[in-house]
Amino acid sequence: MLQSRPRHLLAACLAIAVAGCHQLDFHPRVPEGEIDIYDDLFAVSVVDEMHAVAVGYYGAVYWTDDGGDHWHKGDAETDDLLYSVSMADTEHGWAVGQVGTILRTDDGGRSWHRQPNLKEDEGSHLFGVHAIDANTAWAVGEWGSRILTEDGGATWKDESLTISTDHPMFVWLSLPDQQRVREGKKVYEDVGLNNITCLDPPSRKCWIVGEFGYIFHSEDLGGTWLRGEILGDVRMDPILFPYNVIRIQPGDKKRLAEFAKKIEDQTHLNVLIDPFVSARELADFGHPEDPYALFDIISARIDETKSVLEEAGILLDRMRMPNKPPWDYEDFLSDDPTFLERYFEGRKAEQSMIRVSVIQNPYLFTVFFKDADEGLISGLGGVILRSEDGGRTWRYEDAGRKQALFSVAEADGRAIAVGEKGFVRVSTDDGKTWKEPPPDSFPPVFTFMRDLGFEHKQRVGFIVGQQGMVLRTKDGGKKWTKVLPPGEVGLGRLL
């Protein structure tokens, strides 16, 4: 440290000397309100053919009122990352982001003001927002955040996902959190909700997607939410075990290996290993004072199953065993005396078995519905889901690659999904099949494209992404051109 000090003094002296010879100019290099640094953009809201707003890194807000020919910098008065934006009309809208940030604009994105809310107090990130009208909006985010305003954002009502005593995750909570649940206090579910969308009035349908394959649909603008179901074609009959036997028979090993091979490359699919014991085994080995003999049997059968799956190519981190033996059950008994009894009851079946099934838990980024019935979802690993019944059930469609697809939308009979490293897929049959876009329909893009949207007439649309990139279409997505940054200007470079 002593040796480096003269260097710092020299640098300071040089700075003073230069300042004495040349007047330093700290004035902006571009007019106020114009874009100087092209930050990463994470979301865009397209109001009509003329008006759109995009938001992103370090509080970046860009707005246009001439169809995207010129973009201007809005005054967000924050350095927080902004993950989503939704405009109710040409003047009013919201943006949400880091640590519960909610911003409101009443002048088309030119200026914004912060709206206090409970998620800001909790420090929970907000990932998605949808403006139903100038007074009503939903926002979603981490820790199951789901909040609603009906007064323009003056107040926000908490409708977040919480854990109850009968919730599957209750037993995995810390003891203090379990006690909070018993006392009726809120303990939020550890899941991120990434996107929310609603159809325009008079429809009252809305949808939410997020981590772990979470999909919700509502028929009453979010008054009630119901879970959607992802349908899969990979199933397997249970592995049966004779009394007090832990080895899997050769025929069952073959079936299990064949099951694993079907999903080996579908890394968004995990495997549930669910053990059950017969009434006889429970009576002989499941003593309340000493359950460890039964625990040993269950654990050995689980380990056998895991071993076969691993040999067939399923990594251990894709296996889920929520009902494995609770070896630390005594830690729970003082607060929950019936804990072990309920575990035994939940593991009892007519015959000892291991049920192996697929857990549909893809990481989902964006949901889009063109009408009340037909919808699309994009996600991590090239996931595309399609629904024909308003979001009640979903099926996988093949995108052809495993790169992330961050956003999906449809216009004029053409569905488009965009993602990382310039990954684009197009469908002209309502999302049933996907292929590369035609040559020359997109400019060369090698960075991420984070969001896309169209105006209501489905002609003008924008894609936003890394280094302030904005692509525009004027023909419903057939042809896209770059409008930002101008020329070769990119992130961190000044005009």
Please place each PLM-identified region on the residue numbering.
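Periplasmic peptidoglycan-binding/anchoring modules of Gram-negative envelope and division proteins
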Residues: 241-281, 306, 310, 359-361
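Bacterial N-terminal signal peptides
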Residues: 11-19
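Acidic/histidine-rich, surface-exposed loop or edge segments in extracytoplasmic proteins
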Residues: 234-243, 286
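Extracytoplasmic/periplasmic, Sec-exported soluble proteins
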Residues: 247-251, 290-301, 359
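Residue-level hotspots at or immediately adjacent to binding/recognition sites across diverse folds
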Residues: 21-236, 254, 265, 280, ...
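Periplasmic OmpA/Pal-like peptidoglycan-binding modules at the C-termini of bacterial envelope proteins
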Residues: 265-269, 281-288, 300-362, 369
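Bacterial N-terminal signal peptides that target proteins for export
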Residues: 2-10
